[in-house]
Curated annotation (Swiss-Prot):
Pfam families: AAA_lid_4, RuvB_C, RuvB_N. This is Holliday junction branch migration complex subunit RuvB. The lineage of its organism: Bacteria, Pseudomonadati, Pseudomonadota, Betaproteobacteria, Rhodocyclales. The gene is ruvB. It is found in: Cytoplasm. Residues 267-352 are annotated as: Head domain (RuvB-H).
Length: 352
């Protein structure tokens, strides 16, 4: 099973990775994070739904129903969890699935919640089965059963919990068990952002960072950010560095383009690793089909890195196909590299 920490290790220096790079980047993200739904850009349908559900829960003086947020990394699941707590006017307690190793870890969190508080569990698909078992009655009945004592003297004690809201986030909704998934009343999938939406996010972040940027400059960064706010904000900070040294601190479209070309991020948001693999497919294997092991050997990367770090975005964008015979480049990527795709059926012996 490929998890977040493994993905970070596989590509620690990729500028266009949707995973947070380090604690310093986490701190910057927190500073740039919108605090209210009114400030949140994109995900219009989810935003509207949450606004209605939160307003209704507050009107009835109830805890919001449990919320499951899923989708690719870097799209704002953690941000939405913080916004839910802020809009409800309650505290947020944050943890992650791998941290909750024992039932007692979860019990300690739950028993310290105030009424209507939000408990946010990131990577909730990584909860251990024993912790999940404790969570089920907590979500349904706001009660937990804990064992006191050991051996023959051990006894089960039922503890009442204040009504609370669990917000779970995952990049792998399919790995959630059915009983856990069924206990969420609100289930929302986050989608990739449009360039226009990311342009607004880049402009807002630039204001918070005191960076001068034109609308065209913001859009140029947005177009190369792979539909992901985390990547857009990271690119903005690197373009800011370039602009301060080379352009008097002002980001125009030309400055953004020059900075991103220097950083090896092209007009499709592909970086050196992406282009290395795609060019090998086109030039060494005629566009495929090519087996994963051959492709890994050709570019000097592991098969895990190709499958879990490089491929997902290329497949999602339609630049690469997985077939029973191997990987194949699509027509659009031949065009991007300025090459003519081979004609079906091979060479015409009669020149027709």
């Amino acid at each position: 099973m490929i998890e977040t920490d493994k993905l970070r290790a596989a590509a620690p220096e990729r500028l266009i990775s949707p995973q947070p790079a380090d604690r310093q980047e986490d701190a910057v993200e927190r500073a740039l994070r919108p605090k209210r739904l009114a400030e949140y850009v994109g995900q219009a349908k989810i935003r509207e739904q949450l606004e209605i559900f939160i307003h209704a829960a507050k009107k009835r003086s109830e805890a919001l129903d449990h919320v499951l947020l899923f989708g690719p990394p870097g799209l704002g699941k953690t941000t939405l969890a913080h916004i839910v707590a802020a809009e409800m006017g309650v505290n947020l307690r944050q943890t992650s699935g791998p941290v909750l190793e024992r039932a007692g870890d979860l019990a300690a969190l739950l028993t310290n919640l105030e009424p209507h508080d939000v408990l946010f569990i990131d990577e909730i698909h990584r909860l251990s089965p024993v912790v999940e078992e404790i969570l089920y009655p907590a979500l349904e009945d706001f009660q937990i059963d804990i064992m006191i004592g050991e051996g023959p003297a051990a006894r089960s004690v039922k503890l009442d919990l204040p009504p609370f809201t669990l917000v779970g986030a995952t990049t792998r909704a399919g790995m959630l068990t059915n009983p856990l998934r069924d206990r969420f009343g609100i289930v929302s999938r986050l989608e990739f952002y449009t360039p226009d939406e990311l342009g607004f996010i880049v402009s807002r972040s630039a204001r918070l960072l005191n960076v001068e940027i034109d609308d065209d400059g913001a859009l140029e960064i947005a177009r190369r950010a792979r539909g992901t706010p985390r990547i857009a904000n990271r690119l903005l900070r690197r373009v800011r560095d370039y602009a301060e040294v080379k352009a008097g601190g002002h980001i125009t479209r030309a400055v953004a383009d020059a900075a991103l070309r220097m950083l090896d991020v092209d007009s499709l948001g592909l970086d050196l690793m992406d282009r290395k693999m795609l060019s090998a497919m086109l030039e060494k294997f005629g566009g495929g089909p090519v087996g994963l092991d051959n492709l890994a050997a050709a570019i000097g990367e592991s098969t895990d890195t190709i499958e879990d770090v490089i491929e997902p975005y290329l497949i999602q964008q339609g630049y690469l196909q997985r077939t029973p015979r191997g990987r194949m480049a699509t027509h659009s990527i031949w065009q991007h590299f300025g090459l003519a795709p081979p004609r079906p059926g091979g060479t015409d012996l009669f020149g027709g």
